[in-house]
């Protein structure tokens, strides 16, 4: 099997951009073991924090931060304020994909054979802002049924579903 390019899960902060909330910490703590397990990078975008804040996250999730530490050690954790070129092709996760930009999880797995991808997940009830949705090349509905998933469910299912497809292509 051809070596796959890297998937970067990008948590986009649509909560308060000025205050470091518990919700931010918990989302990172939940995403880190998923990214580690399914060989993804983890990026956080527009979060009001620095690396010192990340290193001080204390949680019972993810073996007390063990997987976040491993991602950091392997240079697979990023704090960004914009989409970086090394993330590859920008993809928005959404239950309401634009039909012209819609991509299936299977096609996303095939895409990883050629190029890295960065999949945005919006935190908070507002999801991803319009400018992010418009800037993305593709829109991924991981359920393929237009089912809206709670944020942490999406964080877990997107890498898992795509990873499973990559095993059979």
Swiss-Prot record:
Family matches, as Pfam families: DUF531 (PF04407)
Q: Which domain of life is it from?
A: Archaea
UniProt-recorded name of the protein:
Uncharacterized protein MJ0224
């Amino acid at each position: 099997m051809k070596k796959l390019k890297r998937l970067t899960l990008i948590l986009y902060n649509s909560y308060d951009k000025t205050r470091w909330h518990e919700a931010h910490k918990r989302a990172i703590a939940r995403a880190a073991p998923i990214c580690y397990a399914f060989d993804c990078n983890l990026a956080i975008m527009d979060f009001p924090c620095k690396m010192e804040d990340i290193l001080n996250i204390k949680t019972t999730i993810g073996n007390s931060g063990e997987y976040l530490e491993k991602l950091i050690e392997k240079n697979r954790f990023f704090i960004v304020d914009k989409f970086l070129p090394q993330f590859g092709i920008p993809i928005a996760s959404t239950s309401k994909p634009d039909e012209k930009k819609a991509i299936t999880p299977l096609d996303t797995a095939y895409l990883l054979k050629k190029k890295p991808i960065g999949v945005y997940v919006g935190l908070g009830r507002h999801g991803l802002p319009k400018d992010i949705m418009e800037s993305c090349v593709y829109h991924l509905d991981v359920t393929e049924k237009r089912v809206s998933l709670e944020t942490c469910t999406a964080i877990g299912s997107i890498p898992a579903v795509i990873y499973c497809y990559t095993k059979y292509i």
